[in-house]
């Protein structure tokens, strides 16, 4: 079932031509759980601070790749000196495909997405506003002195994703390059949210006239949504 493949391809297209580094997955950096509070007086800078772009998104694909990977477009944490625009993109490759039933599919996708709320690297405080669609990060001065990089942050996230046995591999993409087209990226992220909403809609809503449905456009454009929608209708 093809759902987010076009979104993933668009993310790659936006990165084409820009310098992208592959980082090692580092293990051993502590996770502070719910105690990861960084005051403004303790932070070195904020990724996505001062109304700069601050984006986060997760897309799921069925068996698209088998190796974990951390990619970085822009300066790494020790190289940053002030607030910069920021994006965190996760592409999760699941083994054995995705469920083909609305309820199970939606819950599987949300379970993968919710990992971002439960990873708290010491000195790296993620601030998520679902209403505003923002995901910014406060980075502490002390953590930078201890050597915090995106390798440690990404390593913790990858480890957390793999607590879900359905996950085959994870590609994490961090973007801090001010030259990156964040506006275009935000449009793709909005489209990915519409896809997820359409899955939920197909699961929960009574079948109505497709011509008056607010999600008709995304349903028409995404093959997997059409399959899901008409599969529900036939049950």
Features from the language model and the residues they span:
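Extended non-catalytic scaffold regions that mediate assembly and binding
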Residues: 1-2, 25-33, 137-141, 170, ...
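Long, charged N-terminal interaction/targeting segments
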Residues: 33-171
């Amino acid at each position: 079932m093809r759902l987010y493949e076009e979104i993933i391809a668009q993310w790659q297209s936006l990165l084409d031509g820009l310098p992208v580094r592959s980082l090692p997955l580092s293990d051993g950096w502590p996770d502070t759980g719910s105690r990861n509070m960084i005051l403004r007086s303790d932070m070195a800078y904020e990724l996505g601070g001062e109304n700069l772009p601050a984006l986060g998104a997760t897309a799921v694909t069925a068996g698209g790749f088998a190796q974990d990977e951390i990619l970085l477009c822009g300066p790494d944490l020790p190289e940053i000196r002030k607030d910069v625009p920021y994006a965190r993109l996760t592409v999760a490759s699941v083994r054995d495909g995705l469920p083909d039933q609305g309820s199970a599919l939606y819950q599987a996708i949300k379970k993968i997405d919710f990992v971002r709320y439960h990873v708290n690297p010491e000195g790296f405080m993620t601030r998520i506003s679902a209403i505003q669609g923002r995901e910014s990060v406060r980075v502490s001065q002390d953590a930078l002195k201890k050597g915090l990089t995106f390798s440690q942050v990404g390593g913790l996230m990858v480890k957390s994703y793999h607590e879900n046995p359905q996950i085959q591999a994870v590609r994490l993409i961090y973007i801090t390059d001010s030259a990156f087209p964040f506006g275009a990226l935000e449009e793709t992220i909005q489209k990915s949210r519409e896809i997820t909403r359409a899955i939920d809609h197909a699961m929960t809503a009574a079948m109505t006239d497709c011509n008056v449905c607010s999600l008709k456009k995304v349903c028409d454009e995404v093959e997997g949504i059409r399959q899901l929608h008409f599969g529900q209708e036939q049950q």
